[in-house]
Swiss-Prot record:
Cofactor binding: number and manner: Binds 1 Mg(2+) ion per subunit.
Cofactor: Mg(2+)
SUPFAM superfamilies in the record: Glutathione synthetase ATP-binding domain-like, Succinyl-CoA synthetase domains
Protein name listed in UniProt: Succinate--CoA ligase [ADP-forming] subunit beta
Associated pathway: Carbohydrate metabolism; tricarboxylic acid cycle; succinate from succinyl-CoA (ligase route): step 1/1
HAMAP family, per database record: Succ_CoA_beta
Quaternary structure (record): Heterotetramer of two alpha and two beta subunits.
Family: Belongs to the succinate/malate CoA ligase beta subunit family.
Amino acids binding ATP: K46, G53, R54, G55, E99, T102, E107
MF term (GO), any: succinate-CoA ligase (GDP-forming) activity
BP GO annotations: succinyl-CoA metabolic process; tricarboxylic acid cycle
Role summary: Succinyl-CoA synthetase functions in the citric acid cycle (TCA), coupling the hydrolysis of succinyl-CoA to the synthesis of either ATP or GTP and thus represents the only step of substrate-level phosphorylation in the TCA. The beta subunit provides nucleotide specificity of the enzyme and binds the substrate succinate, while the binding sites for coenzyme A and phosphate are found in the alpha subunit.
Gene that produces this protein: sucC
Taxonomic source organism: Hahella chejuensis (strain KCTC 2396)
Length: 388
């Protein structure tokens, strides 16, 4: 689960990390009042969305008057911000962050991620702050420093000092960096994070370290024991179909094609998308109904798929193991009748009672094509989507 920048900075502040004084505002008047509370003659205003690239898209601005703050708020609040990380519709801006201006002398990068390869929290630091760290990793990987955290002993001060010395920090800055490093490590572990980034971690003209930006991603599987973090969830930043799917424990990701896919099992779902692509089609979604492909879940899955106006045909690919294919076929037939599916539906059943399931589909009288194999299913659904 992603957090907004202002939420991440609240967590940083709770752990004693240096962040700018700021307020998340929902109106232009509130934003101007925030500037008065902060004081000073310059402020930074930032549109709050779950996406990077805000600065290039005009969603971050340095302002010198309350009139500029008002204009920025009126421009973005209630509107969508489109960045290179969003789709063409962008994401809605419901709040803007108004915060104090910071004098910057140098920009660094500091982040942490749960590395599945080592099964450890891995911290990364670089002198190349303020830019996309992915580009740094690709073009100059030697500029990324790493520290692997042993889960038995936790983050250690010496690891912070090693990174700080490699970044070229002076003695006072090494102490500050160590405090930030240990604070972030504790935050990461306490709150079950999957990723955090401070980009940039700046050195001010006064020589102090300051967390100018904050990105936090929480492990969704751990939200049951993180009630405070769970309450920070902003559903407006999610695709409505994905949010609806989550309520039914369906794994759904919207894509840009015209062939809806409904599959049981994530691996089979990815393979299904691959073979559709191989035969010239374009998947409209990833949808894993899981092991319990009941009529109710299949019905909801159809509703979600058909809510996408781009979908011209649907491919259902089910492997029957414990759940018999004839029962799955009953569920598909019932779902198609209940939802009133008007577009072609291609179904491939394999496994327990697959032949009986295919016969039920063929005898249903509905616009359902029973495929004999996965290749046949892919060919059939691509032709159906093309109107052939």
């Amino acid at each position: 689960m992603n957090l907004h920048e202002y939420q991440a900075k609240q967590l940083f502040a709770d752990y004693g990390l240096p962040v700018s004084k700021g307020f998340a505002c929902e109106s232009a008047q509130e934003a101007m009042s925030a500037a008065d509370s902060i004081g000073g003659s310059q402020w930074v205003v930032k549109a709050q969305v779950h996406a990077g690239g805000r600065g290039k898209a005009g969603g971050v601005k340095l302002v010198s008057s309350k009139e500029e703050i008002k204009a920025f708020a009126e421009k973005w609040l209630g509107h969508n911000l489109v960045t290179y990380q969003t789709d063409e519709k962008g994401q809605p801006v419901n709040k803007i962050l108004v915060e104090s201006c910071t004098d910057i002398d140098q920009e660094l990068y500091l982040g942490a991620v749960m590395d599945r390869g080592t099964r450890r929290i891995v911290f990364m630091a670089s002198t190349e702050g303020g830019v996309e760290i992915e580009k740094v990793a690709e073009e100059t990987p030697e500029k990324i420093l790493k520290a692997v955290i042993d889960p038995l002993v936790g983050a250690q001060p010496y690891q912070a000092r090693e990174l700080a010395f490699a970044l070229g920090l002076n003695s006072d800055q090494v102490k500050q960096f160590t405090k930030i490093f240990l604070g972030l490590a504790k935050l990461f572990q306490d709150l079950d994070l999957a990723l955090l980034e401070v980009n940039p971690l700046v050195i001010t003209k006064g020589g102090n370290l300051h967390c100018l930006d904050a990105k936090v991603v929480v492990d969704g599987n751990a939200l049951y024991r993180q009630p405070r973090i769970r309450d920070m969830h902003d559903p407006s930043q999610e695709d409505p179909r994905e949010a609806h799917a989550a309520k039914w424990e369906l794994n759904y990701v919207a894509l840009e094609g015209n062939i809806g896919c409904m599959v049981n099992g994530a691996g089979l779902a990815m393979g299904t998308m691959d073979i559709v692509k191989l035969h010239g089609g374009a998947p409209a979604n990833f949808l894993d109904v899981g092991g319990g492909a009941t009529k109710e879940r299949v019905t909801e899955a159809f509703k979600i798929i058909l809510s996408d106006d781009n979908v011209k045909a649907v491919l259902v690919n089910i492997f029957g193991g414990i759940v018999r294919c004839d029962l799955i076929a009953d569920g598909i037939i019932g779902a198609v009748e209940e939802v009133g599916v008007k577009i072609p539906v291609v179904v491939r059943l394999e496994g327990n009672n697959a032949e009986l399931g295919a016969k039920k589909l063929a005898d249903s009288g509905l616009n359902i094509i029973a495929a004999e194999s996965l290749t046949h299913a892919a060919e059939a659904v691509v032709k159906a989507a093309e109107g052939k």
